[in-house]
Amino acid sequence: MARVFLIVLDSLGIGAMPDAGQFGDEGTNTLRSATGGSDAHYPNLKEMGLFNIDGVDFSKGTREPSAAYARMTEKSRGKDTTIGHWEIAGVISEKPLPVYPHGFPESVLQEFKRRTGRGVLCNKPYSGTEVIKAYGDEHVKTGKLIVYTSADSVFQIAAHEEVVPLEELYEDCRIARKILTGEHGVGRVIARPFVGSNGQYTRTTNRHDFSLEPPRDTMLDVLKLAGKDVIGVGKIHDIFAGRGLTDFVYTKGNADGIDKTLSYLDQNFEGLCFINLVDFDMLYGHRNDIEGYAKALTAFDEALPEIMHKMREDDLLMITADHGCDPGYTCSTDHSREYTPLVMYGKNLSPGNLGTRKTFADIGATVLHALSVEGNIAGESVL
């Protein structure tokens, strides 16, 4: 009964790609910034080979890694969550999704206001924590929705949970998702609920993503069609618009995501458990919080022995990322165009350096290979 546990450490890039300058990300390195250029607090990741990966030049790594490891190259034209996860799952995007550096067109907003019955505030790129400081009071007074974007292909809606109930906010997001198609088909519509009063507001964990559907079948669809279990943990369900999953569960942050992963390790299933740990990106990368990022990575490292102990003889653990978000890159709080790591551990898997791969899609191809399923997706198995 083969099982694959694929964990995405959301935003853990390991160094700028050659074309990073085209994205404004030259010199970024999330792993180096988050660790302070030291592997001292990550003994389990070090032992597995994270710091032996091509291009990770600030650590000597370990002499005898316990896992197989590789540097992954993003072939798609993008650096966001949707594009990154799609490519991991075997879909390469030749064109970037639309972005709105000057805000959304009036035609989109008018239709959104008509269908939701609410006005709109902001409509420009903004930091998620700053936008509720700037517009929170006016939103509470008027009930108008705070609509904003970023350097990524996102339409974000912030609303106070006591002004706009969560289910209404989620319905407003579904309305926006239906409007934002074709030329305005953004990667994600994101619900950003918050609480607080009088200019002192904080975002809650009740975020939801409403993603564009993948343009073709991913490894999830292939596995489901083959009769395998396909389990999504965290925002995996939202990223893939629910497609290809047989079961899913949301999480309230990294600790909850790790707990749910441990729970699935104890369960009998045959197929894939696909986990996204979002705190690295949402709480620390975007906020330039180096210390927070480092602590979160340490917490994950400390959880690895229990994860590995619970693995069965034919289980495969894969650890990767979907893009970068360098907390030390003060020119921006946006995602960064970086290589990502792949660390693979199995009791029957030979450790060693798998070099630099041409696409994230090799991960999806490897998952299919490990589960003895054939499918028409991009990428080549590393096994």
Where are the predicted features?
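Feature captures the catalytic ectodomains and active-site-proximal regions of enzymes
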Residues: 1-383
